[in-house]
Amino acid sequence: MRQGHAPEESEPGCEAPCAGPCHAQRVLQALNAYRRSGTLTDVVLRAGGRDFPCHRAALSAGSAYFRSLFAAGRPERGPAVVPVVPVAPEAPGTSPAGAAAALAVVLDYVYGAGVRLRAEDEAAAVLALAERLGVAGLREACVRFLEGRLRAANSLALRRVAAAFSLAPLAERCGRVLRQAFAEVARHADFLELAPDEVVALLADPALGVAREEAVFEAAMRWVRHDAPARRGQLRRLLEHVRLPLLAPAYFLEKVEADELLQACGECRPLLLEARACFILGREAGALRTRPRRFMDLAEVIVVIGGCDRKGLLKLPFADAYHPESQRWTPLPSLPGYTRSEFAACALRNDVYVSGGHINSHDVWMFSSHLHTWIKVASLHKGRWRHKMAVVQGQLFAVGGFDGLRRLHSVERYDPFSNTWAAAAPLPEAVSSAAVASCAGKLFVIGGARQGGVNTDKVQCFDPKEDRWSLRSPAPFSQRCLEAVSLEDTIYVMGGLMSKIFTYDPGTDVWGEAAVLPSPVESCGVTVCDGKVHILGGRDDRGESTDKVFTFDPSSGQVEVQPSLQRCTSSHGCVTIIQSLGR
């Protein structure tokens, strides 16, 4: 029995002339021709003083707004006039001509005539109208056009459009362009019209794509001078986010300190004094305004010097610089007399100092970051190892240690301008292998080994202004082979095979716990880089050197595992300096 074809199937070889996209396109073309000639139209849209005869059915098919409007209305004998007004008086394209032009583009799209956008202002006006009328496809077409036209010159204007219509991808792209081309963006008129909060947010961004901080300072001052009487009150607020210590010293003297607006602003004086102190005494490790922005030619790098191999038998000759952002290692000249061990290392005025050690215990070497070479400087009066160094008020302090017979009370201070060491007040209790850190203008010596080899929990505090020591609240541990760094007025202590990172607040004399480490180490390298505490290498609980690296972020309280060191090492030097990435 012969079976018939299903109703929806057509005979083989036959084409349905009333189906398919071509037919739909012909219908739309006919409707668009009727619209332009006013044929069979049943509604009039009015915008900017112009009338646009249209078909309700076509508008309802292409616009959620008109579909809802016409479905709720009652049939009328003649064509109704529907005013199409902007969303808000300040919306793009709100002039009469702009409103009419935007509606013409929307109607072309609804009737299938295509869309040809020529400028960002036009696209923004059409986007606003398409958003209001619920023409989804046209909205996406406008967004694609704006993304394709995004440049430094219009990034601020398009960011406002993105914010107005909640266009997250466009806003993100605008933000990228703003950061990458900030110096160019700041030269355009749109930048001068930003609100104070917007300027502050830009200046505070650590990812600004500027080669030098001078560009940030000049942008801030250009914005203020655009309307100085009204904006001079924002100077302090803006200058807080300019990293003045990163300016060239000559530029700072000629352009910043000599600026009339800044000279008249008493609120700005502490910031200028802070920058001047950094130029003279050296930067404070971890201070935000002394850290290069992420995409500068300059960057903070971690310098790792020498140390002992896995079994502690060999003294490593290497010195390397590590850039955490790119995870790139760069070899540096080896420290002369590398066979020394248990030396102390510290950074002062962006140079690296290494003092003492088990062999040549009086020697002090300086690695000049400018000359990229090691230079021998004045020797210690008292040879020592298992000591520590720290910087307070631009001077280097060598504290305690061991001379082969006894733990040392001795403290020496180094003046880099005269290249001389002088005795400072001795420690109340002699210690070696203690943690030493400077914070709030004072020196703190935490824990360590006393005479007889017994560990202590004492915290000894030195005030360089009075050349006097005092005792603070004892640490919640008694350990040696400790390390400490300070960051934002807090001291972080670790090492000593302790499983935790401890905190000490010199202002309140209170101890606390910050985080738990994945594995305990001692004699590790600890430094602050990019606002985080980096813990590199050290000896594990089996007495072997490790290549593990951890970072602790005080802002989140999280400890993260980082890529390993190039080799296992312990009892090494570890400091942070600023270096050109092109070197």
From Swiss-Prot:
Is Methyltransferase given among the entry's keywords? no
What keywords are assigned to this protein?
Kelch repeat, Repeat
The record's annotation in InterPro entries points to: BACK (IPR011705), BTB-kelch_protein (IPR017096), BTB/POZ_dom (IPR000210), Kelch-typ_b-propeller (IPR015915), Kelch_1 (IPR006652), KLHL35_BTB_POZ_dom (IPR030601), SKP1/BTB/POZ_sf (IPR011333)
Annotated BTB domain residues: 41-119
GO CC, sorted alphabetically, is:
Cul3-RING ubiquitin ligase complex; cytoplasm
The cross-references to SUPFAM superfamilies, in alphabetical order and at most eight, read: Kelch motif, POZ domain
Q: Where are the Kelch repeats?
A: 301-350, 352-394, 395-441, 443-489, 490-531, 533-579
GO MF annotation, one: ubiquitin-like ligase-substrate adaptor activity
Any one GO biological process? proteasome-mediated ubiquitin-dependent protein catabolic process
- Domain called BACK: residue spans: 146-248
Instruction: Identify this protein by name.
Output: Kelch-like protein 35
